[in-house]
Amino acid sequence: MLKNDLFLRALKRQPCSRTPIWVMRQAGRYLPEYRAVREKTDFLTLCKTPELATEVTIQPVELMGVDAAIIFSDILVVNEAMGMNVEIIESKGIKLTPPIRSQADIDKLIVPDIDEKLGYVLDALRMTKRELDNRVPLIGFTGAAWTLFTYAVEGGGSKNYAYAKKMMYREPAMAHALLGKISGVITAYVLKQIEAGADAIQIFDSWASALSEDDYREYALPYIKDTVQAIKAKYPDTPVIVFSKDCNTILSDIADTGCEAMGLGWGIDIGKARAELGDRVALQGNLDPTVLYGTPDRIKAEASKILKSFGQHTEHSGHVFNLGHGILPDMDPENLKLLVEFVKEESAQYH
């Protein structure tokens, strides 16, 4: 039995004594303890060494007091498992080769055996689960098909997604063929993560806002829904969070995927999102990460605004406090610690 199951209870919209909190990229460069591990190796080797991935996954639980751990990995391990060469060069960016721009390129991508190609993530999940010893839940994750598609077609990050959109608008059948192939791997991967011990899954659609509403409905949401529904069919008790960053005008469509919770960027008032959705889903978020550059009083004031905006909890409401995106590398860890402690104390009055 989990000693602290608040995160899972909030996702399932069950009564909680307070609002749980974790933050995206909580295992990362803002922590001196993470940097000490990272100095010994490169980023992808850290992801692929279960002992090290376990160590950095647990650091924020012990140092910051967050209510959930998220396995240390990267969304691009899926692209790599499918046969692409992935280079992650800190401060320079991400390079994937060769870029996927033809049907022949798509055909060359493999549909990997998850245990064989991504076994290191599953080993890290199992090891972390043991080390956590039921202290807090463990989150597994994946990138969404659209986001992984953009990396594959662009060959890295992009400002305007020209190659990805060119394929969408000139060769829509080809775009769907690639999205479908990636989506199948994503689904198999998250099911294996749950089998290995993940208590919840988050789907990161980091580049969601690159698409218009109609295009998001056509090229992104159906694939997210496929993955969510596959999880529901096999592991109905495992909650899924969908983080479609800055898709604030189609919240209802995202809820229609069947997810338990929706991650919000900081560009929307969480109270407005709740008013629109009712208590159909739990909400996660949504403090602007740069607030953590602020003074202690300002950090508390901004966090308080979010708790107040979400408002009083009902029998079927759920809120997980988080940032609206990942914590930045130069943040002061003491400011995150202050935020975590403040949310734990301040949120009880709303429950």
From Swiss-Prot:
It holds the Pfam family URO-D. GO terms for biological process: protoporphyrinogen IX biosynthetic process. The record marks 74 as: Transition state stabilizer. Its EC number is 4.1.1.37. Substrate binds at residues 25-29, 74, 151, 206, 325. SUPFAM superfamilies: UROD/MetE-like. It comes from the Bacteria. It is an enzyme of class 4 (lyase). One of its GO terms (cellular component) is cytosol. The keyword Lyase applies. It is found in: Cytoplasm. It catalyses: uroporphyrinogen III + 4 H(+) = coproporphyrinogen III + 4 CO2. Pathway: Porphyrin-containing compound metabolism; protoporphyrin-IX biosynthesis; coproporphyrinogen-III from 5-aminolevulinate: step 4/4. GO terms for molecular function: uroporphyrinogen decarboxylase activity. Keywords: Cytoplasm, Decarboxylase, Lyase, Porphyrin biosynthesis. Belongs to the uroporphyrinogen decarboxylase family. Catalyzes the decarboxylation of four acetate groups of uroporphyrinogen-III to yield coproporphyrinogen-III. Homodimer. This is Uroporphyrinogen decarboxylase. It comes from Pelodictyon phaeoclathratiforme (strain DSM 5477 / BU-1). The lineage of its organism: Bacteria, Pseudomonadati, Chlorobiota, Chlorobiia, Chlorobiales. The gene is hemE.
